[in-house]
Structure formats: C-alpha cells, structure tokens
C-alpha cells in the first residue's frame, strides 16, 4: 500500500510541472513578436538616420510575412533611398495583403508612372481597393481619374461625395464644380454653394480656401437671396451633424 504522504507529493508535482510548461510558453517569443520587434528596431534605426540598418531589419520582418514591414520598405525606398522600382515592389506586396495606405501608394505609382509605365487601369483598380476601405484620398483620386473616362461622370461624382463625407475639402470643391456644370448630377447652384461653404470650412491651406471663396462669390452673382439663405442653412446643418445627414443630397445622382 502506498503511503498517504506520497500521494500528496504526486498530486502536487503535476500542477507544478504544468506551471513551468506554461511559464516557458508565455515567456518564449511568438511568431507575431518577431516581426514586431524587428519593425521597432528598424524604426529606432530610422529615427537615428541609420537607414541601412533600418532596411536590414525591415527586410528580415518582410521575409516572415509582415505587411507593415513591406509598407515601411516601400516608404524607405520611395523617400530616402529614391528607388521607385523597389518602392513599387514593396508597396504592391503590402497592398496585396490588404494594407490600405500601400494600396493608395501603388495607385499613385501607376497613375504617375513611377517605377513602372503609366497605367491608369491599374491605378483605378488600386484606388478602388483603398476607396472601399474608406480612404478619402483614394476616393478623391479615383473620382478624379474616373472623371476623365467617358461615361463615368456619375460614378466619379459618387466617389467625390464619399470622399467629401470623410472630410476631404478638395472633394467638396469638386462637388461644387459638378453641381455648377451638371456633370454626373443635375445642375444645382444651391448645392454648389453648400459644397463651397464646406470646402472653406474644412480647408487647411490658404490656396484651397481662396479658391472655394472665389467660386462661392461667383455663384452668388447668379443666385437669389432665398437660394443663398437656403445654402447657408443647409451648410450649418451639415456642419452641426458632422456631414452625415447632408451627404444624402450631395451624393444624389441625376
């Protein structure tokens, strides 16, 4: 017969054994920790101006599947290292794994022909990917490209409106022009005035503010007092509601 004290020892040994297994597991680096650590080290090197060391760290992180490392490599090649082909390669690699900012940057590369030939179809494709992920710059650039494509005026207006909804001042100015010209939407001077007001409210640079004010001033020479008052009322309401409610009529197509 086994003594009782030995039974107690056996029951105590089992949880202690598993405790040490758990402790070792928790303290060991996971697969996710490796690229994160390499990215952080690379960022530290970048801040110190040690770009070759940053490059090495981020390439190591890229090899283990980090989309953030791919994006940072694209950023490094695009800026400091001035290599458009390598920048496009890594931006596109990150974009393919769903990195939204990388998708915008790939669109820019194809639109401008940097590191590749100009390819507007590919630019539209990549802007579309980021646009559906709620990136206002992608939505604006997509709208700008579609505006130049025959039969795409309505779709262009839609994306300008979606970008405007996210607070893009240039998109509001583009909407104003569409309402004045009836491009992709019915002519409507009141809504053009609203769009100018919102562009002025959201703009952060003097040039953009002055363009929206100038356009609004020209509009007011063609509008009645009642139209101007209505435009001002709608603008105030739109700002108070943080652009959400007003977009239903700014986005409306003919």
Residue ranges and their predicted role:
Residues 37-45, 71-81, 105-112, 141-149, ...:
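Hydrophobic face of amphipathic alpha-helices that form TPR/SEL1-like repeat modules
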Residues 1-10:
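N-terminal secretory signal peptides that target proteins for export/translocation
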Residues 33, 63-67, 78-80, 96-100, ...:
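Short helix-capping/linker turns of helical repeat alpha-solenoids
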Residues 34-64, 75-78:
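Alpha-helical segment of the N-proximal tetratricopeptide repeat
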Residues 207-254:
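Terminal, low-structured helical/coil segments at or just beyond the last alpha-helical repeat
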